[in-house]
Amino acid sequence: TLRDLVSYNDKHNDANGEDNNDGESHNRSYNHGVEGPTDDPDVLTLRARQQRNFIATLMLSQGVPMLLHGDELGRTQQGNNNGYAQDNELTWMHWDAVDQPLLEFTAALARLRREHPTFRRSRFFNGRPVRREEGA
């Protein structure tokens, strides 16, 4: 999840019953100084900023923005990067734990994207030059 991307350096797949051997071990994530949950306000501020950075990059890029369910709400799988066998609290939505500022930020970017065509291609990319002089 997006929240896990900024909260964990390592996978935490113990609940999957495979001794944490399943799932990719190279997460390409960064915990910003604390593995998992924290009360450190500096770490929490940085994590929130990074989530907004990632959402903005996604929403302002060309193509169809793809979010994992709950990324806009701050959903976490507690560092489990392979929740394939988890039909339980780990992968369910927790509507009582919605990150309202992140949801509002994501909604504002979705509105911006919808209202300004510059953030959306009007035609499918075909590889041809955009300007006449590039391919004339």
Predicted regions and their residues:
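Active-site and adjacent substrate-binding regions of carbohydrate-active enzymes
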Residues: 1-136
